[in-house]
Amino acid sequence: LVMPKDERGGYSLYDINAKLNHRFSEQDRLFISFYKGKDHVYYKYKDEDKFKQTHNWGNILLNTRWNHVFTPQLFSNTTLAYNRYVFDIRQEETSSIQQPDGSTIINGSNNLFHSGISDLSISTDFDYHPLPAHNIKFGAKYIYHQFAPEVQTVNQHNSDNGYPQTNDNYSLNNSHIHAHDFSLYAEDDLILNEHWKINAGLHFSFFNVQKQTYLSLQSRLSISFQATSNIILKSSFSQMSQCTQLLSTASLAMPSDLWVPVTRHIRPMKSFQYAVGVYYTGIKNWEFSIEGYYKDMYNVLEYKDGESFLGSSHNWEDKVEMGKGRSFGVEFMAQKTAGLLTGWINYTLSKSDRQFSTDGINN
């Protein structure tokens, strides 16, 4: 794409990965990993007026994991991690106005929209094999969240024949939200006999934000039945509660999702999912499966009609509606597991819809 001399645009990105592993003994190992990535898009033009827009987004992740073996049946992983995601949009505009007396007035504005989330977490996970038929996993995790859903700063200035006249700075929706997230979990992979396997688990979460505390107890259950040597039947149920959600803006092709937390007014999203599946391995080096699922969702978030993260002084909580939704579908898969050529082909047929009780969103 060739642009005029007064018009420019471009895209760049980079990714950095680093890993370090060290074995202190047969019982203790340390794993350190680092990742940083950033994408940058810009567009600008210049004639009598000037305009420039940049869009940046990226992640940084630092993870330290200590693996300790207590006994041949019990080991643990303790992880300390920091994760940060940000994206921003910056616009700079300058316009010139020629006055009848020959003087020139220059008006300018700099607008910056910034959003992001950073997490500092520590977790301990245990894996325990008391018997060959039992694989028990349990652990705990704490996360300190720092949300910046919407931070907008505006600078407006003008000059007359090079002499500054005004220079105004102000902020819109300069919101920062801090939250404490603590969870406990336990699950057991249990082999009952040669035909039946069960995985059962519980997850407890404590989420504190803006002096409001949300508690939840979530259950998970999956059952597997070996009907024949080549056919396995599976079914599962899972209950989830989510205290952070992604708000998406469909009008922008580039990443523009906002990570937002529950607040005093926004409740956690809850979901209940049911699934069944049939798996067949009767053909050598091939696996086939068909799975169906149904999911109910409550307290889902969507922008009201005409709203987005840009161009409004309203807080993000005033731009969204809470509603309910459902999704269901069926998935087919064929996989070649061995031979000169391996791979898989997958087809999914699904539907998802949302319903809101107010007129703020088209139902």
Predicted regions and their residues:
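Surface-exposed extracellular loop regions of Gram-negative outer-membrane beta-barrel proteins
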Residues: 40, 86, 151-154, 229-274, ...
